[in-house]
């Protein structure tokens, strides 16, 4: 039995086609090399984005205007209704508890007044609307705002 080595490996006959070398002499793919005669496509390739004499798309679309405020503070909001669903017995609710209800790990939290309060809450959030504070304090609870 003969030992097979890497240099013995060959592709199966007919599985590989030879690369066509164009533009070499006057044969079938010679002279114009399958590009036809004359014209832009026979000469140099057209650059990407070239629109053939009309204004290109990247020049016809307006530039962005204005600016992006990098100091903008975005709040994740939670309503009183959702808070009551998560904590039906009320009690002390920290900012981290609220973040776990929202499903986020970082950022700021704002409490909104959508819904009715039936139990006492002692809640700590970054911000709360005036109506939300009024609803919770009317149910004998407290709201501590961190910001």
Curated annotation (Swiss-Prot):
The UniProt record lists the keyword Cell membrane: no
Ranges for region Disordered: 1-49
Compositional bias of kind Basic residues: 1-22
Single Gene Ontology MF annotation: rRNA binding
One GO cellular component term noted in the UniProt record for this chain: cytosolic large ribosomal subunit
Keyword set, alphabetical order: Ribonucleoprotein, Ribosomal protein, RNA-binding, rRNA-binding
Subunit details: Part of the 50S ribosomal subunit.
Name recorded for this polypeptide: Large ribosomal subunit protein uL15
Reported function: Binds to the 23S rRNA.
Gene Ontology process terms (BP): translation
Signal peptide positions (record): none
Top-level taxon of the source organism: Bacteria
Protein family (similarity comment): Belongs to the universal ribosomal protein uL15 family.
């Amino acid at each position: 039995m003969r030992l097979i080595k890497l240099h013995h490996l060959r592709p199966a006959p007919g599985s590989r086609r030879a690369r066509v070398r164009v533009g070499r002499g006057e044969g079938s793919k010679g002279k114009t090399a399958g590009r036809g005669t004359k014209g832009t496509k026979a000469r140099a390739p057209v650059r990407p984005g070239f629109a053939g004499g009309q204004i290109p798309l990247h020049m016809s679309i307006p530039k962005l205007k204005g600016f992006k405020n990098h100091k903008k503070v975005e709040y994740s909001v939670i309503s009183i209704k959702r808070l009551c669903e998560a904590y039906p017995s009320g009690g002390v609710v920290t900012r981290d508890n609220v973040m776990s209800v929202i499903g986020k790990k970082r950022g700021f939290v704002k409490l909104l007044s959508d819904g009715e309060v039936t139990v006492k809450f002692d809640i700590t959030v970054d911000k709360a609307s005036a109506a939300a504070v009024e609803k919770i304090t009317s149910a004998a609870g407290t709201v501590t705002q961190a910001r």
